[in-house]
């Protein structure tokens, strides 16, 4: 997920049919990759709202012109090992895995990697991205991103998964974290160029973090290395996040289970239930880091795992600052962490728990924003109330068939309420709103606490953020093949279809639109998209004519352009087509119109979209990541070509004619 922050002051306020690749779609259409990885107060008028719900048969017969910001020729489906963009646009790489972040860092040599070098080079598998103002140089900006995870068999030569060397283990640890990078901009095209500047920084799996909020110092966070329970080294599996109005960024620790070993050694009912819920291996971990570092062995350090799974906050303008982990926001597989500031300065932070049948959360601060006071503002997320959502549909259960048929009222929609879990107070204490849990336990065992209050089970809630133009919330629900499953997966189904999850064995995902009262406890919701093949009866595109939309599946990260259009990046390629970035209209006759803007290289995921009037950026994650691909036999050669190993990288797209993104020529 990506965000641009051009000016801080503005932020106060069913199975798919397979198509052959010879199929050509209308110029505004494109095939979306299907997700192969299934685990891991608006200001619009009533009349505008009325026009966005359904489209008449007569309107469906005529092709509808794309909205401003979406006026480009859609990219056709492909399996090319490159970034494919519309005619009139060009693409380049800003930075790739291994490129130096510091001027004294070595150039990347894939055959001679070291942990020492990796700590000063661009990390692996960049995911979340943000583009922020430069504090002193009007000709530069600051690019920030997370490095979610490493894929050692494809990044390291002579790698044996069962017996990694000590150096290989440490290279992997250093490949995680974040990069902060100064960039300059071409005045004509908007293309960005990386620079060596004093703000450049790499945060790794060994960087010191401070634990803050109600769980800080609790016995469950104390280890032999840190008996205070307030200091932890590193951050792992940082997925989506968000830029804050006070000039920091948030990043969610997501699939942390893969780094730890020996869950079978964990004792106590609640701790054991927690590691099982996260999916920690009962024996050796995937990467075998526990062989070199005791902290990844639950048999030796049972509390180290409790120090991960939080939203972290980083100040990119102070390279010496210590990043923090916010325990008041709860501990789970955080996907996203997006902030909205109400008119009175209250901060609301939204986040999803990216796993099947998990929950969505928001945090409402008790402190107010103080403009220009970063030190104060970085404590805002330590005091306030954490909520989890409960959703209800407006239609009788019998009208939800599981096949995507709309209920009689014509919409998948309903209401919701936010249920309080804990309140963190100014004196450092935490008040629990869950019977049987202390406030500190709610902060650590958030999933288990949410179970107790009747939270709603969702289909892998990922990116979740407020549209700055219309004030509504949008959430990507990537998929859930176990929803209402039958046959071999029946035992894995925790819940049947419902109005908020109306597709049985949901392989293609949903996009939900919410109108929240922000600091309050009630909201309404509707499904904007039921993703998949528009020829399938199960799909729905906000009432837009199906024959004029791109098929889209497995929505993951979200962004918004200056016109208020929604942009969605996808994750997966089960039908063989490359992933992409899609623009979606939200208002009037364009509501639900989906057009493909780009596709990424073979077997890559599209992450961290940033959409400005001058440039579109995506993080190209894990190009060539297949079961067969290795360092010696790569499945992709992007971005360097030839016989090179693939490198995750930042791709940028810009106009060649100097016009604005998504606008017809003046």
Regions found by a protein language model. Name each.
Residues 13-29, 35-39, 49, 55-666:
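Conserved small-residue
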């Amino acid at each position: 997920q990506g965000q641009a922050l051009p000016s801080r002051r503005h932020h106060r306020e069913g199975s798919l049919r397979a198509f052959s690749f010879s199929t050509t779609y209308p110029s505004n259409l494109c095939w979306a990759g299907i997700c192969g990885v299934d685990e891991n107060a608006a200001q619009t008028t009533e009349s505008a709202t009325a026009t966005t719900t359904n489209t008449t048969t007569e309107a469906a017969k005529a092709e509808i012109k794309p909205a401003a910001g979406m006026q480009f020729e859609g990219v056709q489906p492909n399996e090319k090992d490159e970034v494919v963009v519309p005619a009139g646009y060009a693409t380049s790489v800003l930075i790739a895995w291994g490129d130096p972040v510091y001027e004294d860092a070595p150039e990347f040599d894939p055959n001679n990697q070291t942990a020492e070098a990796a700590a000063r080079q661009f990390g692996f598998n960049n995911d979340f991205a943000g583009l922020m103002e430069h504090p002193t140089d009007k000709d530069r900006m600051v690019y920030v991103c997370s490095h979610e995870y490493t894929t050692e068999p494809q990044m390291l030569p002579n790698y044996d998964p069962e017996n990694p060397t000590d150096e290989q283990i440490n290279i992997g640890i250093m490949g995680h974290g974040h990069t902060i990078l100064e960039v300059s901009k071409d005045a004509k095209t908007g293309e960005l160029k990386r620079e060596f500047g004093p703000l450049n920084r790499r945060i790794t799996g060994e960087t010191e973090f401070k634990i803050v909020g109600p769980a800080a110092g609790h016995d469950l966070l104390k280890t032999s290395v840190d008996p205070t329970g307030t200091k932890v080294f590193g951050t792992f599996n940082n997925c989506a996040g968000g830029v804050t109005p006070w000039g920091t960024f948030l990043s969610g620790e997501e699939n942390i289970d893969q780094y730890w070993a020996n869950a079978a050694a964990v004792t106590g009912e609640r701790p054991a239930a927690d590691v099982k819920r996260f999916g920690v291996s009962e024996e050796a971990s995937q990467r075998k880091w526990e062989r070199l570092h005791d902290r990844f062995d639950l048999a030796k350090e049972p509390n180290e795992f409790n120090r991960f799974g939080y939203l972290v906050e980083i100040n990119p303008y102070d390279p010496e600052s210590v990043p923090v982990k916010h325990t008041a926001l709860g501990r789970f597989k955080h996907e996203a962490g997006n902030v909205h500031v109400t008119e009175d300065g209250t901060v609301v932070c939204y986040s999803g728990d990216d796993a099947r049948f998990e929950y969505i959360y928001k945090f409402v601060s008790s402190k107010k924003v103080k403009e220009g006071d970063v030190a104060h503002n970085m404590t805002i997320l330590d005091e306030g109330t954490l909520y989890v959502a409960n959703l209800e549909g407006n239609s009788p259960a019998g009208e939800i068939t599981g096949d995507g048929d709309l209920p009689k009222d014509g919409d998948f929609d309903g209401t919701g309420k936010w249920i309080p879990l804990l309140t963190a107070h100014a004196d450092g204490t935490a008040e629990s709103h869950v019977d049987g849990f202390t406030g500190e336990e709610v902060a650590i065992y958030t999933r288990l606490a949410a179970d107790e209050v009747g939270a709603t089970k969702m289909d892998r809630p990922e990116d979740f953020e407020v549209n700055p133009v219309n004030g509504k919330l949008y959430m990507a629900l990537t998929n859930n093949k176990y929803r209402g499953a039958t046959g071999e997966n029946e035992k894995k189904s925790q819940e049947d279809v419902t109005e908020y999850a109306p597709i049985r064995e949901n392989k293609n995902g949903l996009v939900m639109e919410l109108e929240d009262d922000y600091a309050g406890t009630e909201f309404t919701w509707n499904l904007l998209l039921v993703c998949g093949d528009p020829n399938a009866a199960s799909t729905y595109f906000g009432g837009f004519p199906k024959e004029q939309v791109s098929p889209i599946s497995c929505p993951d990260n979200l962004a918004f352009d200056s016109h208020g259009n929604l942009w969605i990046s996808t994750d997966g390629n089960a039908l063989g087509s490359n992933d992409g970035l899609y623009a979606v209209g939200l208002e009037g006759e364009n509501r639900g119109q989906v057009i493909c803007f780009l596709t990424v290289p073979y077997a890559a995921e599209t992450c961290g979209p940033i959409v400005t009037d001058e440039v579109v950026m995506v993080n190209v994650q894990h190009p060539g990541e297949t079961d067969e691909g290795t360092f010696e036999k790569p499945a992709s050669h992007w971005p360097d070509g030839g016989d090179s190993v693939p490198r995750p990288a930042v791709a940028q797209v810009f106009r060649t004619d100097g016009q604005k993104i998504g606008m017809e020529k003046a």
